[in-house]
Amino acid sequence: MKRTHLASFSNRDKTQEEEGEDGNGDNRVIMNHYKNYEAGLIPWPPKNYTCSFCRREFRSAQALGGHMNVHRRDRAKLRQIPSWLFEPHHHTPIANPNPNFSSSSSSSTTTAHLEPSLTNQRSKTTPFPSARFDLLDSTTSYGGLMMDREKNKSNVCSREIKKSAIDACHSVRCEISRGDLMNKKDDQVMGLELGMSLRNPNQVLDLELRLGYL
């Protein structure tokens, strides 16, 4: 009994010594890590900063701050947009022109049939940019045609004025030439008459005698 008791005590002492050695070893390892950490040999453990909006992780607080500023700007822009754009559109029921039409058939018409008609009405009332550009092109082409017509009219008027002026000058020249011819004919007739009177001196004497007789 004494031997077994002594053996148990010896075993306990050995286990305590081993545990003490293990504890001292762990303490030594911790002290070595702490010394290396103070000396700067062990870096800081990496820390991730998560965004509260999109749960994106960043390695530095500065990067997270810049990312949060972007989210704040987006929220400020959304606040400036009017709220009625985000509300669902409530379509008013279209009045039935036929009074004999039953209410059951009108209730069976769904919004799926109403929406295409509304889109068609909007497409009719509000022209698209392509239609606007077509209108601009048509107006510009019409304006160009009108300008060309005005130019052609002015050219025709100028031609007619020139033609009338040329005709007037030609008629004046013709009248002048006719007057010259008539004057020449009168001069020739007078010359002939004078010549005839000079050629017949008897007639002249006869006139003088008659005057004396009277």
UniProtKB/Swiss-Prot annotation:
The keyword Nucleus applies. One of its GO terms (molecular function) is zinc ion binding. PANTHER family: OS07G0101800 PROTEIN, ZINC FINGER PROTEIN 11. A motif (Nuclear localization signal) lies at residues 72-79. GO terms for biological process: regulation of DNA-templated transcription. Residues 102-111 have a biased composition (Low complexity). Signal peptide: none annotated. Residues 117-128 have a biased composition (Polar residues). It is found in: Nucleus. Probable transcription factor that may regulate cell division and growth. Residues 1-27, 89-130 are annotated as: Disordered. The lineage of its organism: Eukaryota, Viridiplantae, Streptophyta, Embryophyta, Tracheophyta. Expressed in roots, stems, axillary buds and flowers. InterPro entries: Plant_dev_regulator, Znf_C2H2_sf, Znf_C2H2_type. Plants over-expressing ZFP11 show are dwarf, have abnormal leaf morphology, flower early and most of the plants are sterile. The stunting phenotype is due to reduced cell size and cell numbers. The keyword Transcription applies. This is Zinc finger protein 11. A zinc finger (C2H2-type) spans 49-71. GO terms for cellular component: nucleus. Keywords: Developmental protein, Growth regulation, Metal-binding, Nucleus, Transcription, Transcription regulation, Zinc, Zinc-finger.
